[in-house]
Amino acid sequence: MKPYISVVIKPTLYCNESCSHCYHTPGERILGNISLETLDRLFEMVSNEYQSAWFIWHGGEPMTLPMSFYKSVMELEEKHFGKNTFRVGNTIQTNGTLLNRRFMAYCREKAINVGVSWEGPYNSVLRELDPEKAVSMLSDKDNRYSVSSTISAETALKQKELYRFFRDRGTNLSLSPVIPAGCARCGNTVPDPDDYIRGSIETFDEWLHDADSKIPLVPHYLYVLNYLGDPTPSDCAHTSCLTKWICVNPDGSIYPCAKACPEEFRMGNVNEISALSEAFSSEGFRRILAGSVARREKCASCEVYRYCNGGCSMDAY
């Protein structure tokens, strides 16, 4: 059996917001949820091929599904993985606006991590609704949670302010740029590369020398680990995520990433294969693997290559 895999599951592409940087255009945000039969089949394949797995419930907005859905999910996980918490874990990535005390209590009971997409004081730049009240409740109730902030053209030079905002709250934070896909292909949300780099360097310098900081700022924290000798350098928490990471859409189709993947990278469908190894033998996977190899060969002579590993296959541009 292989050691582990991370599986992003998009149980729905529907969302209660219309964020200007979303990977999915309004036409893609259709009603239609993943079936429990598809999940049952997926969990069976994962449990047969991997020692452990981490499931990330994404979207769309996963909280548009009722809590009864997630109770059924937990029952299916127990069916295939048993009660061994070392074999399986879960994170729900949400915009936070639909979180309530009842679901937070359920997450605590089942040790489900909560990831909230939130830009703090700059939230209105990209989003319509603000989850601050829900985030405060997560903190008060001792839920395991973290925040992901997306850096736009407007906030590229304000990353340091974002870091300070979340540092003062003691909130684990990850920063990532808007990528030119989906809704972000239109408008002016994608940050200027020079501004983004400048803002990132300023934030890294402050975080590195901040004696009061108790949060592992991502991706900067990973760069430090790489510098200190991590054997598998990357700007992704999953190192070279290819073969260790997949995304499953509501219809069961498999892609190598949760970000905006073109159809050419489609790796098959959960309902049409008997093992995940088939997905990793697909033409779609071979295409993204070839592109990754070509990019790394191009980047290999760069002095910082050993720390970033050529970047992410989906947003290195």
Where do the model's predicted regions map?
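Canonical Radical SAM [4Fe-4S] cluster-binding loop centered on the CxxxCxxC motif
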Residues: 2-37
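Cysteine-centered iron-sulfur cluster-binding motifs in ferredoxin-type domains/subunits
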Residues: 11-18, 61-64, 299-301, 305-307
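Short cysteine/histidine-rich metal-coordination sites, predominantly Zn2+-binding motifs
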Residues: 34-42, 315-317
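Short, positively charged
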Residues: 38, 219-229, 276-283
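Radical SAM/AdoMet-radical enzyme domain recognition
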Residues: 39-58, 65-182, 188-191
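Radical SAM enzyme [4Fe-4S]-AdoMet core and its adjacent flexible, acidic
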Residues: 126-251, 259-269
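Flexible mid-to-C-terminal extensions adjoining Fe-S/redox cofactors in radical SAM and related proteins
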Residues: 261-317
